[in-house]
Amino acid sequence: MNTSDQIFHRKTYAEQMAQQLLQPSPLHMNVRSGVFLSGIRRVGKTTFLRRDLVPALEALGALVIYVDLWADRSKSPAALVLEAVRNTLLQLQTPGSGLLQRFKGLNLGAAGFSFGFQLDSLGTTSGTTLAQAFAELVAKAQVNVVLIVDEVQQALGSEDGNSLLHALKAARDAVNSQPGTPGHFLFLGTGSHKSLITDMATRRAQPFTGALTTAYQVLEQDFVQWQLDAIATTPGVVLPSVAVAWAGFQLMGHRPEELLKALVQLQTGSASSSTPADQAFPIICATLASVAADVELRAIEEFGELGQAIFARIAEGSESGVSGLFGEEALAAYAERTGSQVLPPQVQNLADRMISANLIARPGHGVYTVADPFVRKVWLDRHKLLKL
């Protein structure tokens, strides 16, 4: 594992994903319909995409375009994607550019690529469409083109974003349905809003319906070991054992920033306390986990007593999902808690609002889960204490 740049690299995971995208087996050809990768916030998704997956895809000869829809909130999703595509095409046109050098084996000459359209016209009302641009790019470069759109759910909810998704779907179809195509167009959308990400691949009204959905693999114990090793050379540092640090990392939702924060607090506390690190560290982690979850848990209170009752029913059910939120038994339980009659439309309205707030998710028809397993665990732990 390379630690020279202070980044924990997940080479194996990246190489496996890259191979599945670019060299799918006959049973996994559906990746060419699009892939949607979901994972909770602050678990290292973006770092993995930019520092591991992109290089792994490029190592297999792909041309990769990465766009983060949270990079500039003042710009629309369509503007950000078009800007990234234009920039990539411009680099391919520019003699001596680093990107062009990667494809020097194509014998393009000193002038680089020459496209049959003006870059400024890309995406304009009467100009070149993304489908036309990507089709020409694949035909001339004869490579797989991978477009990664981070926080892709930002494209939902606006006419501009919806038009963008339909344009990308058209690009996928234009390239991948071409007989004997020398390369494919692969679309990878990632995001932290699990329910919306799932909807983008399963709802009939969505352009990428039928695409593959998968969960981001959170960091494991090897990351914890790497983090401990990285700071172990600091003079006078106090560290917990790997097992204790791993347990704390899990408690804090597999969030790298929280692990480092806990280790920093351990140093501060050890200066004024004789408590062994393996005893102090779990307390620090539990406190940080509780504080981090408070933001989400306070948001639940904003949905009133009925909203809290609905959330409780979901949280107390199976981690894989709860159904029957609108059934007679559930409605009776809500009524008992709120002291008034509850009708299915009220429950549906609140459930939809909590989905929009990313508090709960809908992984399947009529099935609901807590969006963040970390928040669910903190909620359950607190309610167990209240029942004692």
Label each residue range with its predicted role.
Residues 33-146, 152-156, 161, 185, ...:
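P-loop NTPase nucleotide-binding core
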Residues 374-388:
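Short, amphipathic alpha-helical interaction segments positioned at domain boundaries
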Residues 363-377:
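Accessory beta->alpha helical hairpin/"wing" motif in late/C-terminal subdomains of nucleic-acid enzymes
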Residues 248-250, 254-342:
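Winged-helix-like regulatory helical subdomains adjacent to P-loop NTPase cores
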